[in-house]
């Protein structure tokens, strides 16, 4: 499993920020910050359908990022810069669920 932490940053408009120990996953952290705030449930649902075996593959397209999901790995693509990152699908799902939970706590106050 991937090691990461979620910290709340900012005083006026606090946001959860994900930091992965391995810098190869920096794009995954940027994806969560950029897309999960608006599309948390959709991202988690797309990942869950593949993890649960309901679909063999899946996809998600947000404002800046897109996902190509397989049971083992998910490719995160920054559609503007063309940068890509491959991450374990289950690890991304777990991080997205935790990020979404933290974001909802902040916005429900």
Regions inferred by a protein language model and the residue ranges of each:
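Short, low-complexity, polar/charged sequence segments that are solvent-exposed and flexible
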Residues: 36-40, 94-97, 106
């Amino acid at each position: 499993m991937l090691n990461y932490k979620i910290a709340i940053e900012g005083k006026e408009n606090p946001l959860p920020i994900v930091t992965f120990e391995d810098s190869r996953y920096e794009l995954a952290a940027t994806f969560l910050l950029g897309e999960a705030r608006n599309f948390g449930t959709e991202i988690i649902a797309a990942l869950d359908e593949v993890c649960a075996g309901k679909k063999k593959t899946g996809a998600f397209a947000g404002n800046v990022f897109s996902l190509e999901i397989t049971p083992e790995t998910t490719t995160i693509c920054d559609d503007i810069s063309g940068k890509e990152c491959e991450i374990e699908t289950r690890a991304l799902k777990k991080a997205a669920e935790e990020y979404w939970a933290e974001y909802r706590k902040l916005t429900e106050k």
